[in-house]
Amino acid sequence: MSKLQDVIVQEMKVKKRIDSAEEIMELKQFIKNYVQSHSFIKSLVLGISGGQDSTLVGKLVQMSVNELREEGIDCTFIAVKLPYGVQKDADEVDQALRFIEPDEIVTVNIKPAVDQSVQSLKEAGIVLTDFQKGNEKARERMKVQFSIASNRQGIVVGTDHSAENITGFYTKYGDGAADIAPIFGLNKRQGRQLLAYLGAPKELYEKTPTADLEDDKPQLPDEDALGVTYEAIDNYLEGKPVTPEEQKVIENHYIRNAHKRELAYTRYTWPKS
């Protein structure tokens, strides 16, 4: 293991192997402890995409909220559907929601807001690329979740995990923004392991991961965008050997996207070297 890989493995907190029952108990306890430590929290808000990560986090949150209510703490889980117009995998979103069984479902179509933002920028002389418009979608989705959380005395729960965090494969202040990120410390295959243990339909954790943000490249697989497989990323995070090319791609992503893992730099926190 290289020196940098050792540093990254320590930072990303991924275990070489997990016990599903113990991990789920630990994740639920984190969520419950956070709510219990903040008496103002009356709801937890999460956008549901139909993918592996939001399905897992959604199930964990609902399980945690159920237990909190049994313990006398009034709390609600609000699952949010955030389509841009007509969502291509809407059936999978609904399948995920049936598995999660959230207390409440809110649907907000982000297309009008995103399109108006893009048009307003265009009128000001700023023409966004399709990729940049994809980031607008991610930020609008998170803005909506924070608006709901504000209205319902809640917090926003994130889906960031270590295989995503190491590569910076999320939009800054978009899907990378949240109050808590319960599944940080898991890699991609461990997330699949937990969903299988929880009895999720295979389609929800065996589907090809995609951010699906770009109009010109619908359903673009994450692995194509990253230039490396999740299998390699997971192996790297577990301290296992990967090919030199895989190591180079992973570490370049990690270094290039360091700013995404930090709050705004100050003159005291900017790592100049």
UniProtKB/Swiss-Prot annotation:
Protein's name in the database: NH(3)-dependent NAD(+) synthetase
Highest taxon above the source species: Bacteria
Chain sites annotated for binding ATP: G47, I48, S49, G50, G51, Q52, D53, S54, T159, K188, T210
Swiss-Prot/TrEMBL keywords: ATP-binding, Ligase, Magnesium, Metal-binding, NAD, Nucleotide-binding
GO cellular component term, pick one: cytoplasm
Gene3D superfamilies: HUPs
Residues that hold deamido-NAD(+) according to the record: R139, K172, D179, H259, K260
EC number: 6.3.1.5
Family under the similarity heading: Belongs to the NAD synthetase family.
UniProt subunit comment: Homodimer.
GO annotation terms (biological process): NAD biosynthetic process
GO MF annotation list: ATP binding; glutaminase activity; metal ion binding; NAD+ synthase (glutamine-hydrolyzing) activity; NAD+ synthase activity
Enzyme class at the top of the EC tree: ligase
Annotated positions binding Mg(2+): D53, E164
Protein source organism: Staphylococcus aureus (strain JH9)
Metabolic or biological pathway, per its Swiss-Prot or TrEMBL entry: Cofactor biosynthesis; NAD(+) biosynthesis; NAD(+) from deamido-NAD(+) (ammonia route): step 1/1
Catalyzed reaction equations: deamido-NAD(+) + NH4(+) + ATP = AMP + diphosphate + NAD(+) + H(+)
Stated role: Catalyzes the ATP-dependent amidation of deamido-NAD to form NAD. Uses ammonia as a nitrogen source.
